[in-house]
């Protein structure tokens, strides 16, 4: 699998029936996503931007993707920076949905 095929997928409905990834599975998928890190069973990325307005604009664009996929990241909007944290709340860890959303966000940013 590559990032293009990952970003072409759609997120599955979130529920406790989703399979939480093992650390090895998460580490494998992470190799497809440059600029993302694993932290406490969550995907994180910090995106440097020009100013607060650009961070807010990017947050809104990510929000539109999140609504379309019905999978929502935690966003931290700061002057010159947008922090993104993704995980599946229902399993309190990572699932394929998180990596699909991250790939779609990468397409938007990169």
Language-model segments: residues:
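Long, contiguous binding/interaction regions
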Residues: 1-110
């Amino acid at each position: 699998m590559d990032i293009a095929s990952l970003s072409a997928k759609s997120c599955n409905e979130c529920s406790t029936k989703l399979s939480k990834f093992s650390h090895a599975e998460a580490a494998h998928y992470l190799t497809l996503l440059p600029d993302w890190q694993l932290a406490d069973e969550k995907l994180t990325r910090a995106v440097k931007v020009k100013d607060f307005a650009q961070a807010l604009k990017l947050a809104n664009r990510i929000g539109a993707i999140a609504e379309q996929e019905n999978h929502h990241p935690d966003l931290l909007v700061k002057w010159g920076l947008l922090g993104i944290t993704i995980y599946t709340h229902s399993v309190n860890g990572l699932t394929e949905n998180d990596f699909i959303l991250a790939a779609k966000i990468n397409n938007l940013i990169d």
